[in-house]
Amino acid sequence: MNSHLSAEGIRNRTSDIAVEIFATCPQSSQVSKEAYLKNVADVARWSEQYGCKGILVYTDNSLVDAWLVSQLIIENTTGLCPLVAVQPVYMHPYTVAKMVASYGFLYDRRIYLNMVAGGFKNDLNQLNDPTPHDRRYERMIEYVQIIKQLLGNETGISFEGEFYKVDKLRMTPPLPPELFPGIFVSGSSEAGLAAAKAMGAVAVKYPKPPGEYENEPPDETIDSGVRVGIIAREDENEAWRVAYERFPVDRKGELAHQLAMKTSDSVWHKQLSELGETLENNPYWLIPFQHYKTFCPYLVGNYSKVAAEVARYIALGFTTFILDIPPNEEELYHMGVVFKRAAELAPVMEVV
């Protein structure tokens, strides 16, 4: 390993565009408890070592609780920020605010919230939540308003909306202003983008190739990010060998993806599925998504080619990157090389 990248956290300090990088925590499904606990601790430590700001923690009906996983992350790192997926149907906004304030009080650690509307109808039906897609985002806006007001006002708040009502509700312990949570939301649909703007949140896309955005760049009034995986090596052929070894073409996985499409009303899921085959020699790669191995596109190729794609996203206005689950420490090293080279291509960029 190159200790230079570890120590420096891949920074270009002469820049004035801040780029934040988040890793993703392993999932708890189909793995033993012992292996999962070790995976979480390892990935959290590696992510911090290689300069990530934080780490996304998934939530859905099949996974262990994201807040408890976040505590494991905090206990195994010194400054890595959990990006906790929050599904409004799971808990009252007061409970989320209480968790954020409690982590601030106990660990002096900032929490980020990744607001999810719930894309799989079966999960929502099991919880008796028939709320339509766009209405879930309208509910989310009220949900986040309550969280932000509770954490930003020590004297208490009253709020009455269409979905929630609180009366003279006060948050203790108070949250120091520097630990106020960052808010992310999936922003591929019109409803998601409107919610991001209303909440002051980062709109995160499961992106199309950067060329697709050159005639329709992201809304400059909203902070924007992308969720991608990266497999890069010095040698192009080696990168693709690793990519197909990790994500082999799988007919069973392809059928699982097609089935998932039928039970999802996520706009991003539909958009990626409609993109079709990746062109030869194009670093933008959808096989892992199309074969139900992961939920984001990948950038694959040699360092320079992948760095150029990353720099194109940054030039378009995407300044937050949420990377896929790293299978080992080595992959975070290679991702670090990519962002270092992207910083050289975009000299106004700083990875923070």
What are these regions (language model features)?
Residues 19-38, 85-89, 93, 177-188, ...:
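Active-site mouth loops of central-metabolism enzymes
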Residues 11, 44-49, 70-79, 100-111, ...:
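Acidic (Asp/Glu)-rich catalytic clusters
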Residues 66-87, 139, 143, 222, ...:
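Alpha-helix-loop-beta-strand connector modules within alpha/beta enzyme cores
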Residues 1-79, 180-181:
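N-terminal beta1-alpha1-beta2 module of alpha/beta enzyme domains
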Residues 32-46, 99, 186-195, 302-312:
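Short, acidic/polar
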Residues 2-17, 127, 133-175, 210-312:
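An alpha-helical appendage that flanks or caps ligand/catalytic pockets
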Residues 39-58, 195-205, 312-319:
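Catalytic domains of carbohydrate-active enzymes, especially glycoside hydrolases
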Residues 15-25, 55-57, 81-86, 111-115, ...:
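Hydrophobic faces of well-ordered beta-strands that scaffold small-molecule active sites
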